[in-house]
Amino acid sequence: MTRQFFGTDGIRGVVGQDPITPDFFIRLGFAIGSILVKNNTDKKIKHPSVVIGKDTRVSGYMLESALEAGFIAAGVDVYLTGPMPTPAIAYLTKALRSQAGIVISASHNPFPDNGVKIFSEAGEKLPDAFEMEVELALNQPIQTVLPHDLGKAKRIDDAPAQYIKFCKSTFPESLNLRGLKIVLDCAHGATYHVAPKIFSELGAEVITLGNEPDGFNINLNVGSTNPQTIKEATLKHKADLGIAFDGDGDRVVMIDHLGHVVDGDQLVLVIARALKQNNQLKGGVVGTLMTNMAIEKALNDLSIGFVRTHVGDRYVLETLLEKGWSIGGENSGHILTLDQHSTGDAIIASLQVLKSLRLLNQSLYEATKDSPLYPQVLINVETSKKIDLENNKSIQDVIKIVESKLNDKGRVLLRPSGTEPKIRVMVEGEDLKEVKFAAEQIAKAVEAEV
């Protein structure tokens, strides 16, 4: 069965356009709720429960109410947290012993977009099979349960305090952040009211940007996808480093004191190196098809195993669980540290990097300067139709020519975006000029076919 609604990271789109509408969200809440009720075999649980959180988009109020109505109509109790980071909902789902967690967010996208992400009772992103079951259930009519079986809704007023305490618990009590000046960029998003408290309570001097959400400014010229803002602030304030989150708090990039952007790949390497040095690394590291070749080489030089999986933190998680490893991530800043949390958490990942720097006795610059990334050029080609990239002779002929020129000192990756109507062309290698030319040639070949 072909997916109609779910992409690589939940459901996402423009508010007011299918499927990001109130009526669809009522149906979605009822569909998921009906599955939870059907799967509830614990007689002690009269009503399954879900935790619903959201980021700071103005549309979150409308969509939250619609989801809430759908779940209650299905006989499911609802816990409402208000604006909270995506990984906070994963944590609270476990802490409140709920059967699922729902986040209303479009992550790093601009405010007109919104969507949903779903977590299991274990605080993990749900497998493809569950999403397919939801897709099927969406085709069924809503049949509200009998009045005495309706669910109830409750606000969790101390959700921020619970999450702050949890995040701080992942940082060793023997360490602190005293003496560090840190610039935080909360992207006017879901971390705005929790992240500054966490880092300051651990001892850091914190300068905060992007902490004044108004419903419309999430990710607007701030956050992990706009690192120039925090780069300028880090240099201006002569800070030791900068930390930028995305709108829902599951991605992070950092800035060293000289203004260099440190992406998710490099941050994973820092964490893995410190764990290896302290004999605490479980197995190896999981990256994705987008992970820079320089990181793979650096891990190999440290005798740390490395495997690639599909793009998307859910696939990184699946591979980590299969192998029994604990560290993985994406260059975009999704970083999983399974010894601390069941999903990618930007705040916790940042704390693990800071812990690693303390253990290595290095600055962020010192910890990353010896592993410069290979030049990587990414071109997004907009498309309105699906293309069989693997079997398109014109495109594949160009790729073969490029790969022969790169030899074993570079690579090509061509894939459709899981969240946008685009085809992503990525080329990386040691020589920037050669890499840029190669990416442009492949992009032209793709454009000719769309």
Task: Give names to the regions the model predicted.
Residues 78-87, 261-264, 288, 309-310:
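Active-site nucleophile and cofactor-binding loops and adjacent substrate-binding regions
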